[in-house]
């Protein structure tokens, strides 16, 4: 049964930039909003100096009040465990500095590359593998974008541009229109892929102007949402996805397997069901990238495979995402089938 988007009733008409501006950045305010005692999080609050906190109201609305183990809360609340210096964890686990060919470009793969349109995000996820990335060396402005466009134009093997970040939808619609127009003028480009978490934390970001932009481009357009738990999907998000479906955007999702958040086959099965009900196909289930500050989210490979095999037994094959790990320097992601 499909999730039939209802007429949104909460903040749907509110400008997404206003919601973004009002995002909570003080852990104490987040705890207060969720009816959680500040005294229980004294050490965790200190971890904000390692990686700032940022959570917009639409995402906070999905978190269960009074529950310190809520899976959405655990993804965004700073933790004293981030101070742990775990073996094998680093500030650049994918060695992306080696692929930073020119500002705003990560050229890891043969026929596609990542275009770092914007460095900021609407929400700071504590497991983010780019939490230490040098965004100041990759400014999201037209001057640096032009250097990136020149690089793409000079590499005829590039068929697909992947908007990444940060979050590329932090760019305003007129900025995205400028970028897409210039990409369309590069004849060897066929596809535009947009990786984003913004629609699930601020669904209002999917504006009519943005949808029109994607409807009119000659490039085949794919959006990959970043959703880890079924509780992140609500009717307002479903409405936003309906707008994208209406303009023939291919919708996929990737998740990260996170201890305490979604390390359960039944939860992943429900996630796949809800994604499909909103017109999104499960794409990747990533093993954690070993970024410094996120070791408390790590699940062993053995446990991950057990969860994955159980998931395969619970649902249809097309609803099972590919279990994958990105290994620095490899020409593609490494898949784990059995």
Curated annotation (Swiss-Prot):
Residues the entry annotates as binding [4Fe-4S] cluster: 121, 125, 128
Catalytic activities: L-lysine = D-beta-lysine
Domain Radical SAM core positions: 107-330
Signal peptide: none
CC cofactor: [4Fe-4S] cluster; pyridoxal 5'-phosphate
Leading EC class: isomerase
Coiled coil: none
Gene Ontology molecular function, alphabetical: 4 iron, 4 sulfur cluster binding; intramolecular aminotransferase activity; metal ion binding
PROSITE patterns, per the entry: RADICAL_SAM
Keywords linked to the UniProt accession: 4Fe-4S, Iron, Iron-sulfur, Isomerase, Metal-binding, Pyridoxal phosphate, S-adenosyl-L-methionine
Bound cofactor: record note: Binds 1 [4Fe-4S] cluster. The cluster is coordinated with 3 cysteines and an exchangeable S-adenosyl-L-methionine.
Residues with the N6-(pyridoxal phosphate)lysine modification: 333
EC number: 5.4.3.-
Role summary: With EpmA is involved in the beta-lysylation step of the post-translational modification of translation elongation factor P (EF-P) on 'Lys-34'. EpmB appears to act before EpmA. Displays lysine 2,3-aminomutase activity, producing (R)-beta-lysine from (S)-alpha-lysine (L-lysine).
Family recorded in the similarity comment: Belongs to the radical SAM superfamily. KamA family.
NCBIfam families in alphabetical order: EFP_modif_epmB, KamA family radical SAM protein
Designated name of the protein: L-lysine 2,3-aminomutase
Organism of this sequence: Haemophilus influenzae (strain ATCC 51907 / DSM 11121 / KW20 / Rd)
Gene: epmB
């Amino acid at each position: 049964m499909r999730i039939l988007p209802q007429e949104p009733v909460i903040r749907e008409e509110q400008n997404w930039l206003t919601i973004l501006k009002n995002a909570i950045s003080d852990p104490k305010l987040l705890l207060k909003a969720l009816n959680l005692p500040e005294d229980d999080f004294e050490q965790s609050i200190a971890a904000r100096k390692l990686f700032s906190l940022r959570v917009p109201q639409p995402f906070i609305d999905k978190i269960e009040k009074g529950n310190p183990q809520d899976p959405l809360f655990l993804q965004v609340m700073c933790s004293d465990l981030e101070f742990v210096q775990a073996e094998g964890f680093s500030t650049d686990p994918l060695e992306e500095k080696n692929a930073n060919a020119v500002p705003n470009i990560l050229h890891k793969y043969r026929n596609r590359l990542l275009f770092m349109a914007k460095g900021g995000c609407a929400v700071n996820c504590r497991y983010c593998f780019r939490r230490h990335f040098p965004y100041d060396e990759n400014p999201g402005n037209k001057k640096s974008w032009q250097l990136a466009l020149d690089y793409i134009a000079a590499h005829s093997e590039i068929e697909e541009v992947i908007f990444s970040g940060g979050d590329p939808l932090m760019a305003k619609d007129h900025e995205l229109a400028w970028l897409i127009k210039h990409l369309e003028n590069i004849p060897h480009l066929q596809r535009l892929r947009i990786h984003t978490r913004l629609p699930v934390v601020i669904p209002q970001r999917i504006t009519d102007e943005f949808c029109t932009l994607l409807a009119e481009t000659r490039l085949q357009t794919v959006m990959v949402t970043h959703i880890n738990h079924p509780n992140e999907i609500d009717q307002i998000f479903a409405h936003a996805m309906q707008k994208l479906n209406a303009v023939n955007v291919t919708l996929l999702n990737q998740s990260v397997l996170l201890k305490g958040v979604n390390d359960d086959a039944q939860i992943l099965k429900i996630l796949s069901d809800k994604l499909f009900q909103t017109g999104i196909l499960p794409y990747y289930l990533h093993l954690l990238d070993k970024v410094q500050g996120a070791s408390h989210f790590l699940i062993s490979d053995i446990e991950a495979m057990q969860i994955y095999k159980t998931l395969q037994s619970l649902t249809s094959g097309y609803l099972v995402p590919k279990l994958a790990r990105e290994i620095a320097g490899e020409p593609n992601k490494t898949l784990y089938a059995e």
